[in-house]
């Protein structure tokens, strides 16, 4: 009988550890979602505005076969100094209105710092 009791308590400990790990994972892996309005096939890629949590971009790539989506990722990566692998087009891959997800957990920046980087590019 002691074996059953000890296995149950070890299962409970494992479950508690797993819950703690899962909670820490949420804290350690923040994903910032930004609504982006994309104007593809522009003369040059640029940040137009960042108001009301909506980022407006001009992208030089055409909206054909996902080229504009790739252009968004490459442009944001270059301008914000964030790895391409940490930027993903979430919703709206075939729309001008998109949701871009940026994983800042390995970038050593906060959400506020990310937004400051975006705003600093508006002045250039």
From Swiss-Prot:
Region (Disordered) residue spans: 1-22
Any one cellular component term from GO for this entry?
A: cytoplasm
What InterPro entries would the database entry show? DUF167, YggU-like_sf
Q: According to its UniProt record, which protein family does this protein belong to? A: Belongs to the UPF0235 family.
Q: What is this protein called?
A: UPF0235 protein
Q: Which organism is it from?
A: Dictyostelium discoideum
């Amino acid at each position: 009988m002691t074996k059953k009791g000890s296995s149950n308590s070890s299962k409970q400990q494992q479950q508690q550890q797993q819950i703690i790990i899962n909670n820490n994972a949420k804290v350690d892996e923040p994903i910032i979602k930004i609504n982006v309005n994309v104007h593809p096939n522009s003369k040059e890629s640029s940040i137009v505005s960042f108001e009301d949590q909506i980022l407006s971009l001009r992208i030089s790539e055409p909206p054909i076969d996902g080229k504009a989506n790739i252009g968004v990722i490459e442009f944001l990566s270059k301008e914000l100094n964030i790895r391409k692998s940490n930027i993903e087009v979430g919703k709206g891959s075939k729309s001008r209105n998109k949701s871009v997800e940026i994983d800042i957990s390995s970038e050593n920046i906060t959400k506020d710092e990310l937004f400051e980087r975006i705003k600093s590019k508006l002045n250039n």
